[in-house]
Each structure stands twice: as C-alpha cells, then as structure tokens.
Amino acid sequence: MKRTIGVLVLVFAVSGLAAAQSNPVMDSVRHIVQRQEKNLVGAAEEMPAEKYGFRPTAQQMTFGTLVMHVTESNHFLCAKLSGDTPAKLELKPTDAKTKLVAAMKSSFSYCGTALAKVNDSGLGEQVKVWGGREMPKAGAAIGLTDDLADHYSQAAMYLRLNGLLPPSAKKKGE
C-alpha cells in the first residue's frame, strides 16, 4: 500500500512538473520581452525630449524613429503570433516624447496580453509577415526577441553618444 501511494505521488509530481514546463519556448520569449520592455522603456524615458531627433549619422534612424519602430514592430509581431489583426498606429517619429513613450508602453502591454495566448504547440503554424512572406510562428517569436535586442543595443549606443547611461548599465537604485 505504501509503495502504491509512493508511486502515485511520484506520478503526480512528475506530471505536474511536465505541465509546468509544457511551454518552455514561449515562456522564454515572454521572459525576454519583459526584460527588453524594462530596458527599452527605460531608454526611451532616459533620452531627453530634445534629443529624440538625434541620429549618429545621416543614414541612421533618429531616436524618435527608433521608439516608433519598436512600438510598431511589437504590435505587428505580437498580433501575428496571437492571431489578432495588427493595430493601425498613428505615430510619427516627430511626435512628442510623451506620446512616443506612452505608445511604446502600450505596445509592450499589448504584447503581454497577446503572447499569453500563444503556446509552444502552435509555433509550427505559418503566419504572413512583412511583404506577405510566410514563416512559422516560431520564426516570428525569434524575430521579436531579436528585434528587441537589436534595437535596445541601438538605443543604448544613442544614449551613450549623448553622455547618458543605458538602463542595463546602471547600478540598482540609480
């Protein structure tokens, strides 16, 4: 009897562990998006409003364009992953800092809600992305995290070129 109870406890424990780890890919994506939200929103807040027109070279995006691009990409990719229709945003890179930062925060909030609907079992489904090109949802999820990492490094460089520390370089409490 004790052996049967022990086996049942072990079966339930293992099945609970398996259930908790049933979406390791999307759980990782959600974690990365949350971390990048902190960094990118922090960078957008750190850059002074008068520097939103800054660009290191004529060929590069302005900081305002960067904030707008991240916001639009978040809405597009998170909608594609969740099966929603991407929102049509009315943003310009020359919009006020307060509007661009609020839109970025809203885009990350939307991604949190949208990505909560996505699980690993659907990552093989095809979605249409830019230019009507198709890719698996897994590719869109990786694209989202890559895009956020790429643009945070860009934002960090823009901040440093203006004598400011990016959020990830600050000590706790700074």
Task: Give a label for each model feature.
Residues 1-4:
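Positively charged n-region of N-terminal signal peptides that target proteins for export
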Residues 6-16:
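Bacterial N-terminal signal peptides
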Residues 17, 40-41, 64, 104, ...:
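Hydrophobic alpha-helical segments
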Residues 18-22:
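Boundary at the C-terminal end of the N-terminal hydrophobic targeting segment
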Residues 30, 34-41, 51-89, 128-174:
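Short, contiguous alpha-helical
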